[in-house]
């Protein structure tokens, strides 16, 4: 199982759209799981689904009933086309309380108890142990924009990684600037038929040939 981390220190860069398109493209040939690790994902509205549970419950089972963890995970897993996804955290407070070790344990249990080939991690700054999770990833994609503020933030992020002894994270990171894309469909299941999907295909071609 390989972990693919999608992260950006800037906002409004199509990070989640990129992550979901990547997962949908890979799921045509592989078994893929998408995990949203943001404070507020908005996926419930975008998917027009009323999630009956969320990641907080899965973390609870991870700590208190590990023998039933895979069962509970399977019962709450949803889909976008062929891409599996876990219901994201509903509460920001629940999300930020998850420790780095709990994230690592979650990934280990998924690898041990499922046949997923790839996990797409849609990452954010609020995660405990962000840099260590990025280090754990087999591939990292960082998205940016072409304006001066965005370029400066990416450069600062690079410098912080290097000064914090996470230079290995930067070395395996591929940076892409998403072009301006208009009229993305409201339905996430339609993203693979967009200009964005063609761009993502170009970005990942050499990594997944």
Task: Describe these PLM feature segments.
Residues 4, 33-35, 84-86, 139-141, ...:
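Hydrophobic/aromatic beta-strand patches that form the interior of the parallel beta-sheet core
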Residues 15-16, 95-99, 149-156:
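Active-site-adjacent loop/helix micro-motif of nuclease/hydrolase catalytic cores
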């Amino acid at each position: 199982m390989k972990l693919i981390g999608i992260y950006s220190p800037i906002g409004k860069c199509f990070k989640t759209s990129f992550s979901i398109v990547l997962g949908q493209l890979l799921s045509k040939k592989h078994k893929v799981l998408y995990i949203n690790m943001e404070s507020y994902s908005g996926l419930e509205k975008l998917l027009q689904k009323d999630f009956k549970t969320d990641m907080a419950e899965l973390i609870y089972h991870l700590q208190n009933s590990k023998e039933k963890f895979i069962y509970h995970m399977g019962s709450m897993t949803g889909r976008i086309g062929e891409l599996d996804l876990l219901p994201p955290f509903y509460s920001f407070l629940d999300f930020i309380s998850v420790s780095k070790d709990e994230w690592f344990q979650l990934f280990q249990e998924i690898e041990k108890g499922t046949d997923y080939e790839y996990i797409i991690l849609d990452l954010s700054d609020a995660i405990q142990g962000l840099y260590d999770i990025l280090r754990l990833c087999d591939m990292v994609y960082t998205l940016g924009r072409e304006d001066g503020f965005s370029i400066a933030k990416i450069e600062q992020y690079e410098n912080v990684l290097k000064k914090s002894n996470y230079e290995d994270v930067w070395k395996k990171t591929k940076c892409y600037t998403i072009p301006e894309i208009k009229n993305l469909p409201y339905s996430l299941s339609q993203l693979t038929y967009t200009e964005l999907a063609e761009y993502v295909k170009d970005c990942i071609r050499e990594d997944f040939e």
